[in-house]
Structures are given as C-alpha cells and as structure tokens.
Amino acid sequence: MSNKEVKAALKSARDAIRNKEYKEALKHCKAVLKQEKNNYNAWVFIGLAAAELEQPDQAKGAYKKAIELEPNQLLAWQGLANLYEKPNQTDVKADLADVYQKLLELYESGDKQKWYDVCNKLVELYHQEKKYVEVAETWQKLIRMKQEEGAEKTELHQLWKKMIQLLKDSTRNQDNKTGQLLLTAFEHALHSADTVPGEDHQNLYKDFIQCLSKFHEVARLEKACHDMMALYPTMSYALEVLCLHFVQSGTLSEEALHCFSRLLEMDANSGPGIIGFGIKCLKENKYREAVKSLTEGLQKTKQCPAAWYYLAEAQMKIHEHRNAVLSCNQALEALGTPEGANSQWKNLALQLKAEILIKIADASAAEEAIKALEQIADGSSDPMVLALRGQAYLNKGLMDQASKISQELLLSHPHLAEAHALEGFIHYSQENYEQAEKSFLNAIERKAGTAEYHQYLGLTYWFMSDETKKDKGKALTQFLKAAKLDSYLGSAFCYLGNYYRDIAGDISRARGCYKKAFELDETDEESGTAAVSLSVELGDMDTALSILNEVTEKARPGTAKWAWLHRGLYYLRTGQPSQAVADLQAALRADPKDSNCWESLGEAYFNRGSYSTALKSFRKASELNPGLVYSIYRAAALEQILGKYENAIATYHEILKKTENYVPALKG
C-alpha cells in the first residue's frame, strides 16, 4: 500500500465514522496498520470506532497505543477522556483524573476555553471523590489563569465563592491543609466583594468566622471578629462569637469582660452575653447571681460546654449538688458532638462531676464518681484524681482500696493537702479521732482556705470527747472558720446551733444558726425542726409558722412530714381542729406508721366533733403501738359517747389490766 493509498484509507475510515459505519472504519484502519503499524491516526480511529461498538477494552488499548506513539498529540487524549466519561465505565476515576491533567497541560498554551472546561470537569471529579486538597489546588490554578487574562474583580469574587462552596464540606475532616486553603478562599472573597458593607458581604463574613471557630484559629478569629465589628457596628453576631470564644478558652481577661459588657449593652437578651456576665459573677464569688445568669444564658445558647461547666461549679459552691451533676452531664453531652470536642474541658467536667458526687456521699453516687474518674485521660497518674478516687472508695465502703490510695499518696505527695485530708476522712469514719485530728491539721496547714477541712476538724472535736466538744477553742472555732470560708455550708451552721443550744445555752443564737442552716439546705430536717422548736420556746410563733408555711407550700405529697406534724400540732394547741386534721393527714401520707401522729389526728377529729373518725384514729394508734394507753382510753371514752357501752366497758377493763391505777379509766 502506497503512501497515497494509506491517506485514502484513513479518509475512508473518517467518513465511515462520520456515517456511523464503525465496523467499516475498523476494516480501513486495520488495512492501514498492516502497512504502517505505528500510524497514529489509525490507532485513534480504532479507538473511536471500538468505543462506539461498545468494545471499551479494545478502544482503551488503541488510544494508549496512539498516546505511546505521540504523547503530546491531543486526539488520543481527548478520545480516552470521552471513553472514560461514558456511564458504563467504572473504576476509572483515577485514570480519568490523569487524562484531564494531561489535557490541561496540552490546552494551557492554546485553547483557553477548553482548558477551563477540562479544569471544571477535573474539579468536579475530585469533589465527588472528596479529594479536597486537589479540589482547592486545581481551582486555584483556574483562578490564577483568569487573573493572568485580566478577569474582572466581580468574576474573581464569584470564583472564590465557588471555591468556598466546593470546600465547605471539608471542615468535617478537620484536615489542616484543606482548612487553610478554605480560609484563604474566604479572605480573597471578602476582599474582592463589590458592595462593602452589604448583605452578601455580611453573610460571607459570618460564614468565615464560623469556619475559623471550627478550625480553632484563635488569632485569625479574634482579628476577623474585630474587623467585622468595625464594618457592622450594630450587628451582634461577631461579638457573640468572640464572647463564646473567650468563654470556651477559659480566660477572663479585661478584653473578655469588655466584650461581655458591650454585648449586653447591644442586646440585653444575648445568650453569650448573659453567660459571660454569669462567669464574671462566679469569679467574683457571687454564686447565686452566677447560677441565675448562667442558667438564663444557657436557655438561649445550649451548645456551650464551658458554660455548663461553670454553671456546675457555681451550683456546687451553693451546695446544689444534684443540679450540679446534671449540669456536668450537659457539659459532657455538648463535648460529645464533633463541634464541641475538647479533651481538656472533658477531663475538667469529669473531675468536677466526681467531686460533686463525692459530696452527695451515698454509695450509688460514689459508684458514679468512680466511673467518671475512670474516663479522665491520664487520671491514674494525677494525684488530685487519685485523692478523689480514694474518697469515692471510702463513700462506697471500700476501706482497703481507700487506705491503699491514701498511703501511696502520702508517700509520693506528702505536701498535697488532699492526701492528708483523705487520711483524715478514713480515720474519722473509723472513729479514730486523735489520728483524724492530726490528719486534718496537716491538711489545713497546706490548704487553710478549705472550709470542708475545718468542718471535719470541728466534727472530730465534737465527737472526740466532752472536753473537746465544750472547748471554745476546739469545735466552736473550727465550725466558725468553716462557716466563714463557705457561707453556704449549712452543716457548719447546724453544728454551731448544736453548740449554742447544748453547750452555751444561748437559745437565741442557736435559733439563728439553725434558721440559717435550714435556709441554705431545705432538706435538713434537723435544722428546720430545731429552728421551729426554739422559735416556739422563745415565744416567736410568727417565725415558727413562717418556716413551716414555707416548707409545706413547696412540699410534694408524701414529703416534709416534720413540717406538717409541727404545724398540725400548733393548730391543735390553738383550737383550729380542721386545719390540724389537714396537716396531720399530710404528715401521715409521709409516714403512715407513726402512732403518735395517729393519736394527734384522733385528738383533732375529736375537737372537731367527728367522733367516729376520731375513734378510728385512736384505734389505729393503739394497733401500731399497744403501749399508747392514752389512745386506748380515748377510744373507750368515744365508744361511751357514741353509746357503745359494752365496748367501752371492755376497753376500760383492758386498760386497768395493764395500768391498775389509771384514773381516767377508773372514772370511765
């Protein structure tokens, strides 16, 4: 076949392809290859025809042969790209990306529009494969090409915005290189915006700041927030983000305080602003205000782990331990989300939770505390965590484990107050008061500002002996110090009340201490009862009733027996039987087996004239406690009033068998 014939055969092959006669085209190409086995066009035409005949392997082989012959010729690369783009081609995306890369190289110095088309296809391919670094680098090449061509600022702005769209899903991967490329795209988009200030620019700034928060770019975040605040002084968004950043960073600098104040001036209902104010109150030891503000702020801005932690801390300071545990759980829940993940805050929240559970001091809380401590990273080597673990074991009754930790800590960390305190708690629980005294004195020497150590030293003196209980310089001094260091420590005020009532005989001062203890802890029945009893003794019924009214108003059914009983007895004494009946019934709902309460209820019914019901109440009292002669007598007297004479006589005889000279029964 001559050169002329080869050209003619190739022309025939081209015409056959144009006419969709692909098998005919293959015949012409094969004829050419017999003569010229390295004919580039013949291999390209075979690739085209085979692709149309759905023979992809043959097509691929032909294109690759052509590329081998002429690696910088376009036709074979274009054909291979078309082949790989067909829907029936699978597992070829990596190969297709290589083909696009080569086409970009070949188009770069020539057809710019085709270069852009291929570049877009390559970016789309990388995006489908979630290869975000390649997406960013390829798109940046496109932008550079546009810049070299002198593209308008508006077009470049749209291209940077498109890059942001392409990379926005990459923030889930937390890949640093992609993150930096995304932030660069934001910065270029912001600088190339036409309308500044304007709504689009404002929204772009918001997205940029949100992105900086996710990547923990502290310096850039602060700068971006300040820049946005300067451009949009009436918008609170940037200031809110900055305030939350300060909250999460755990720092309370002058700048942070200024931001909190400025935000509240701008928007008094701003969640982050109210949270910031709450943290300020916490640092100033205004614990109740802190709890109020942090609770309010968190209703508006729930996903803020640090704020939940600070709320738990404030609640612990005012001894709202159950609520504080719930706040710690909220902090840990918020830290469980990808946005909230932070190992430092997680460890702090777990440790605080354990500390609070230990203060609750029952076995189930101790078990929960141990579980929390086990989750702390590197907790086994932290002496503070070990000291808490020792206390949890002690609360759970695991004395051997608690003692082992105590001994190890005293050897490895003899200067740690918590190590000596743990030893003191163990001795105290075993009633080894002399040893407990030494341990608590050692703890106080190392950390004098801890109210709990003074409280326990005071309790040690209280139970050690009558001498130490009565010695003003011992128990009393320690309880006073504890109360001064922690004005929310109700138990310190309760023991001060015990001292003034039982040792000093100062009823007025004792009443004040019990009242304070009860105000701090409304579950403290001992203090509440004592405050009421001493108020009655002092003739101050108004105070006694105000305490009882406050408790009964808040009480759930079946609770606060002591308050219902005291108020019921007061109404009984003052001739108000109907009110007495209602209160004594409420007391019995809390404790249906209290025989004395049934007896008092019988008396109230009797005074009200409800004799049959009174009889039942007295009988119930004597059933529960057969030794209550008065209840048996009252039942007999009521049977007599109700005309049940035989029953009454039998009951009187029953009383006289037990108590021969019981005058009321003899009279009956």
PLM ranges: what are they?
Residues 5-34, 563-566:
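Alpha-helical segment of the N-proximal tetratricopeptide repeat
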Residues 14, 48, 82, 124, ...:
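Residue-level recognition of tetratricopeptide repeat
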Residues 18-19, 52, 86, 128, ...:
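Register position in tetratricopeptide repeats
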Residues 25, 59, 96, 135, ...:
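Single-residue signature of alpha-solenoid repeat helices
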Residues 31-32, 65-66, 102-103, 142, ...:
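Canonical positions in the second alpha-helix
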Residues 35, 69, 106-110, 145, ...:
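Structural marker of alpha-solenoid helical repeat scaffolds
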Residues 45, 79, 121, 162, ...:
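Canonical tetratricopeptide repeat
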